């Protein structure tokens, strides 16, 4: 196997390098730019409107003249007139569709709204904060405009103002600013957001407010380019350790997503999460009744097992594999895929960890998904199988062969994903090398299922590594010039060698349902 192919796997002489490479190579699977939790939100709540207002009436066309009058009135020395004007600006920004954010920014009202945050009137502060929240919910340029107007230091001051409505709206606004990316996240952290934010995690805070606080914590954890500093993570983790016990499903979902983002920050962050002793609370959430909780928990524990073997073992010791049958058979294909990804990282561990997968009885399910799953799930299953051929013992590989892995494995050679083709070819090559005296039986099965034809065709593939490996397999194992069982690199006995011998198959064949 060429060195660049070895780097795809996370278990070889340079195991940890392989883990990192494996994770880099499959970023499209679960560490892509898609957002599982919403990073920005607008406040369009109309419950505080007067009874005389009809909140269900759709807004009319944008009135530029009204905006001009509103901006002028917002600078009035009459407190009542000013409050009405700021409230009108907020209403313009609280429409369900296409709020005129750019029009309001262009009108020059931003500095006025920011100045209102320093008012002694909580109602004016609240309305201004609401308007700014919705402006900051827009594009990066619109969020930048709010920051440039000097809103962030004032929002941070308002976190200690004592008025819960103003505090909550300020938290919401800061959440939108932080959610724009790591630059604004770090800016808010430098200005000291953490301690005043975390003080709201207490039993006296209304549930809606606590949901917003938890959502802001998610945004603080979200970005990884760069990831939050270790000092920030250590400060946040005690709060997450409390929130993971909360009975509110929305808070629980955001808490687990926050942990999933932290565990996506590398082995150091993974270790901090482990030391916070939340893993034993994370793992049972894989069986939660809410699929959103399951999804977030699966991502979090999946990120942890991309770490070291020791970090992986802690998750295994928490009983995670007992949840895998339900996740692998889940009605949502996305969960199937992520569950197989999780297993692929276990099969890339040490030999005992590979054996744990077999002992859990889930290898037949992996092979079934390799055969019948959607293509993203099949790709993850191909990784899981190939990792066994590198990490596992020959008897474990033999068990996969007995479970019928070769036909669906060879079928993946017809896909258009060059990386997966290479992964499968490596796996086939490894299986044949381990087979020893049983290599002839394995080659016969590969030929019967059409795998040989596919390998022969791949000798013409445009990818150099693929066509060279295809040629190598044909030359070593399917050439009439050689005795199949005696080729260089093959084990001298059937799936044996200098590793523990393969136990005899029991009557009726192997049973991995236990």
Swiss-Prot record:
<comment type="similarity">
    <text>Belongs to the importin alpha family.</text>
</comment>
<dbReference type="GO" id="GO:0005654">
    <property type="term" value="C:nucleoplasm"/>
</dbReference>
<dbReference type="Pfam" id="PF00514">
    <property type="entry name" value="Arm"/>
</dbReference>
<keyword id="KW-0677">Repeat</keyword>
<keyword id="KW-0217">Developmental protein</keyword>
<feature type="repeat" description="ARM 3">
    <location>
        <begin position="188"/>
        <end position="226"/>
    </location>
</feature>
<dbReference type="Pfam" id="PF01749">
    <property type="entry name" value="IBB"/>
</dbReference>
<dbReference type="InterPro" id="IPR032413">
    <property type="entry name" value="Arm_3"/>
</dbReference>
<feature type="repeat" description="ARM 1">
    <location>
        <begin position="101"/>
        <end position="142"/>
    </location>
</feature>
<dbReference type="InterPro" id="IPR024931">
    <property type="entry name" value="Importin_alpha"/>
</dbReference>
<keyword id="KW-0963">Cytoplasm</keyword>
<dbReference type="GO" id="GO:0061608">
    <property type="term" value="F:nuclear import signal receptor activity"/>
</dbReference>
<dbReference type="GO" id="GO:0002119">
    <property type="term" value="P:nematode larval development"/>
</dbReference>
<dbReference type="GO" id="GO:0005643">
    <property type="term" value="C:nuclear pore"/>
</dbReference>
<dbReference type="GO" id="GO:0140297">
    <property type="term" value="F:DNA-binding transcription factor binding"/>
</dbReference>
<feature type="repeat" description="ARM 8">
    <location>
        <begin position="394"/>
        <end position="436"/>
    </location>
</feature>
<dbReference type="GO" id="GO:0005635">
    <property type="term" value="C:nuclear envelope"/>
</dbReference>
<feature type="compositionally biased region" description="Basic and acidic residues">
    <location>
        <begin position="12"/>
        <end position="39"/>
    </location>
</feature>
<dbReference type="GO" id="GO:0008139">
    <property type="term" value="F:nuclear localization sequence binding"/>
</dbReference>
<feature type="region of interest" description="Disordered">
    <location>
        <begin position="1"/>
        <end position="62"/>
    </location>
</feature>
<dbReference type="InterPro" id="IPR000225">
    <property type="entry name" value="Armadillo"/>
</dbReference>
<feature type="domain" description="IBB">
    <location>
        <begin position="1"/>
        <end position="51"/>
    </location>
</feature>
<dbReference type="InterPro" id="IPR036975">
    <property type="entry name" value="Importin-a_IBB_sf"/>
</dbReference>
<dbReference type="GO" id="GO:0007292">
    <property type="term" value="P:female gamete generation"/>
</dbReference>
<feature type="region of interest" description="Disordered">
    <location>
        <begin position="485"/>
        <end position="514"/>
    </location>
</feature>
<dbReference type="InterPro" id="IPR002652">
    <property type="entry name" value="Importin-a_IBB"/>
</dbReference>
<feature type="repeat" description="ARM 2">
    <location>
        <begin position="143"/>
        <end position="187"/>
    </location>
</feature>
<dbReference type="GO" id="GO:0048477">
    <property type="term" value="P:oogenesis"/>
</dbReference>
<dbReference type="GO" id="GO:0005737">
    <property type="term" value="C:cytoplasm"/>
</dbReference>
<dbReference type="GO" id="GO:0022414">
    <property type="term" value="P:reproductive process"/>
</dbReference>
<feature type="repeat" description="ARM 6">
    <location>
        <begin position="312"/>
        <end position="353"/>
    </location>
</feature>
<feature type="repeat" description="ARM 7">
    <location>
        <begin position="354"/>
        <end position="393"/>
    </location>
</feature>
<dbReference type="GO" id="GO:0006606">
    <property type="term" value="P:protein import into nucleus"/>
</dbReference>
<dbReference type="GO" id="GO:0009792">
    <property type="term" value="P:embryo development ending in birth or egg hatching"/>
</dbReference>
<dbReference type="Pfam" id="PF16186">
    <property type="entry name" value="Arm_3"/>
</dbReference>
<dbReference type="GO" id="GO:0006999">
    <property type="term" value="P:nuclear pore organization"/>
</dbReference>
<feature type="repeat" description="ARM 5">
    <location>
        <begin position="272"/>
        <end position="311"/>
    </location>
</feature>
<keyword id="KW-0813">Transport</keyword>
<dbReference type="GO" id="GO:0007127">
    <property type="term" value="P:meiosis I"/>
</dbReference>
<keyword id="KW-0539">Nucleus</keyword>
<protein>
    <recommendedName>
        <fullName>Importin subunit alpha-3</fullName>
    </recommendedName>
</protein>
<feature type="repeat" description="ARM 4">
    <location>
        <begin position="227"/>
        <end position="271"/>
    </location>
</feature>
